[in-house]
Amino acid sequence: VQYPPLDNSAILAYSFCMLEHNFFTPPPRILAHRGDSEFYPENTLPAFISAERLKVDVIETDVHLTADNDVVIWHDKTLDHQTNGSGIVEAFTLKQLKMLDAGYYYTKDDGKTFPFRGTGITLMSLDEALETLPDMRFNIDLKTKDSRLPVKFTEIVGKHNAMDRILGASFHTENLQALRSLMPGMSTSFSTYEVFTLFIKQKLGFRPSSREKFKGQVLQVPERYGFLKVLTDRFMRSFHDAGIYIHVWTINDEADMRRLIRMGADAIFTDNPRLLQKVYAAIPIPKNYFKYRAE
């Protein structure tokens, strides 16, 4: 695979982005989706510790606001799918949530066995995650659409002096606007609305400039939105030239991983970080990969 150099303006744009936002130093490649979720219950401490031991670059996770204004790590809106509890996450206090079995429904054999049921795995708070893994970078999706969540979230991040190792994400533009206002030095992705706006502009011929002040530092997108193909060579080149990173979610197929890396994806979300590590190890990528892109 040939990796031709970007022009000088694009390289300067990447350099500026990296200097201003330390989360991208060094730029991540492997984002473990909800931790090592292939082998452990997702978004739990064992999944996070395993991901750290695998030396992944970033753990991707999700947070909700609890009924007592704390921040709990969990993906789903409800508790029914993964725990022995039931109901909306945000209706419970952190203490109540931590009484639930977060490994209750984890299975690798279509429900024949539940190896983590009753082993003491509970939901955890954002505070616990940052305390337990002080050197890990986190990509955190703020799920609750509530103005109190960004406030409490940045308070906890500040308490742990963790701003440089957090990338804030959310489907809700209001959450990201609040994060950028409350903690301007924190890296953020683009919301769904922001991505869609940039996508449409790019399709209409808009070419983003490295001189523009973008709200976020990274586009985190699927390869397709329904019938729309997002990741084209033109799309990737346009935003790379403007200094914007591109992360792709969620890829678990080896052939897809190889293809996206060769296209120039900066990082990939995966449930199977072991496989992605193997793929990266087999593809000859130069050390200065993030200053080069595939044609």
Residue spans for each PLM region:
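Glycine-rich beta-to-alpha transition loops that act as phosphate-gripper elements at the mouths
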Residues: 34-35, 42, 170, 194, ...
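Metal-dependent phosphodiesterase/phospholipase catalytic core, i.e.
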Residues: 19-28, 75-182, 208-242
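Catalytic domains of carbohydrate-active enzymes, especially glycoside hydrolases
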Residues: 50-63
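Hydrophobic faces of well-ordered beta-strands that scaffold small-molecule active sites
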Residues: 30-32, 59-61, 138-140, 166-169, ...
